[in-house]
C-alpha cells in the first residue's frame, strides 16, 4: 500500500476489552482531513459505549453488536493481525460461516461494518468494511405451520382443569388466532384487552416498537379462554401482565418469552408433533397460512400479521402455491 506522506499519518490504536482482561494493539493508517487526528486513542468500553450510542439501537441490538465487536477484536488478536484490511474482514466472515447460522453471520458483519463506518467518521481508522456482504439468508420460512386439524389436536390435549392449564390454553389460542409473536404475548397487559366498536381487541407492543399502536381482534372463543385464565387471578390489576409465571422461582411475575416457547413446545410434543421446525413461532406461520387458505387477500393478511412489507406476506402465498403445484405428480403419471 503506497502512503502519501502529505495526507496520511501513522498512528497507534489501543483496543482494550477489559472484560476479557486482554489488550490488543493494532497499528492503523488513518486519513488526515481538515484537522489533525490524535496520535493515539484507546478503544475501551467507553469507546464502545460511544459507538453503541451512535447507532441508537434497541437493547437487544446493543447486546448483539457489543458481542460482535468484542468477538471481532478477539479474532484479530488470535490471528496476530495488527493492521486489519478488507481481506481480513472477509476472512473473518468466512470463518464465522463455518460455525454460525447465516442470520448470526449477517448481524455480526453488519455490526463490524457500522463500527468501521463510525471509526472513519471519528478519524480513527479508514472504513475498510464498506460494502462487505454478510451471509445470504434464505427467504424460505424455517418453521413449519400446523393444519387446522393439527391445531385442534394440540388444543384438545391441553388440560384446562387447573389455573396453569387454563393459562396455557389461552396463550396457545391467542397466538394461533392472532398470529402473535412470543414477545408480544410477554409484553401484553390486562388493560391492553379492550372493546373497539363491536369487537374485543388486544393492543400490542410489537417487535422493535416502543408503544402499543397496533391491535388484533380477539375472537369470542379466544376471549373466553383469556377471561377464564384471568378469573384465577382475583388480585390482578388492569396494569398487571396478561399472563404470569406459575413456577416456584418467578411465581406471579410477567411470563417470560422462554416460558411461552416452552408452553407451546410442550403442547406440540404432547400432541405428537415433535419437530425442530415446529415451535412457538410456528403458530404465527399457522395464523398467516390459514388466513390465506381461508380466502383472505394479501392486503388483509399483511394488515393482520403486521407485516411492514407485503413481500413478506407474499412469501407465504408463494409457499402455498408451490405446495399446490402438481408438476411432480404429473411427471410421475406420465412415466410410471
Predicted regions and their residues:
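Conserved catalytic core of the tyrosine transesterase superfamily
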Residues: 2-4, 8, 14-336
Amino acid at each position: 500500500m503506497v502512503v502519501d506522506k502529505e495526507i496520511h499519518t501513522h498512528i497507534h490504536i489501543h483496543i482494550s476489552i477489559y472484560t476479557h482482561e486482554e489488550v490488543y494493539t493494532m497499528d492503523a493508517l488513518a486519513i488526515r482531513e481538515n484537522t489533525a487526528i490524535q496520535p493515539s486513542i484507546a478503544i475501551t468500553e467507553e469507546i464502545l459505549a460511544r459507538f453503541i450510542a451512535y447507532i441508537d439501537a434497541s437493547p437487544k441490538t446493543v447486546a448483539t453488536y457489543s458481542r460482535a465487536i468484542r468477538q471481532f477484536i478477539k479474532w484479530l488478536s488470535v490471528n496476530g493481525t495488527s493492521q486489519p484490511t478488507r481481506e481480513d474482514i472477509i476472512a473473518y466472515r468466512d470463518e464465522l460461516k463455518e460455525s454460525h447460522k447465516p442470520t448470526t453471520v449477517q448481524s455480526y458483519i453488519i455490526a463490524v461494518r457500522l463500527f468501521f463506518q463510525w471509526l472513519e467518521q471519528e478519524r480513527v481508522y479508514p472504513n475498510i468494511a464498506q460494502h462487505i456482504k454478510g451471509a445470504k439468508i434464505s427467504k424460505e420460512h424455517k418453521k413449519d405451520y400446523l393444519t387446522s386439524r393439527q391445531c385442534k389436536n394440540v388444543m384438545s390435549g391441553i388440560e384446562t382443569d387447573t389455573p396453569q392449564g387454563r393459562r396455557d390454553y389461552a396463550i396457545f389460542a391467542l397466538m394461533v388466532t392472532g398470529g402473535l409473536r412470543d414477545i408480544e404475548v410477554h409484553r401484553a397487559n390486562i388493560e391492553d384487552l379492550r372493546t373497539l366498536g363491536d369487537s374485543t381487541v388486544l393492543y400490542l407492543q410489537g417487535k422493535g416498537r416502543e408503544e402499543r399502536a397496533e391491535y388484533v381482534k380477539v375472537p369470542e372463543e379466544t376471549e373466553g379462554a383469556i377471561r377464564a385464565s384471568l378469573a384465577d387471578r382475583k388480585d390482578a390489576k388492569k396494569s398487571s401482565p396478561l399472563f404470569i409465571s406459575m413456577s416456584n422461582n418467578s411465581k406471579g411475575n410477567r411470563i417470560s418469552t422462554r416460558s411461552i416457547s416452552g408452553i407451546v413446545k410442550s403442547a406440540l410434543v404432547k400432541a405428537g408433533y415433535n419437530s425442530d421446525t415446529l415451535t412457538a413461532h410456528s403458530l404465527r406461520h399457522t395464523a398467516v397460512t390459514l388466513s390465506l387458505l381461508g380466502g383472505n387477500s394479501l392486503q388483509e393478511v399483511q394488515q393482520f400479521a403486521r407485516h411492514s412489507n407485503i413481500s413478506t406476506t407474499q412469501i407465504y402465498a408463494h409457499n402455498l402455491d408451490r405446495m399446490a403445484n402438481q408438476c411432480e405428480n404429473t411427471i410421475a403419471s406420465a412415466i410410471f
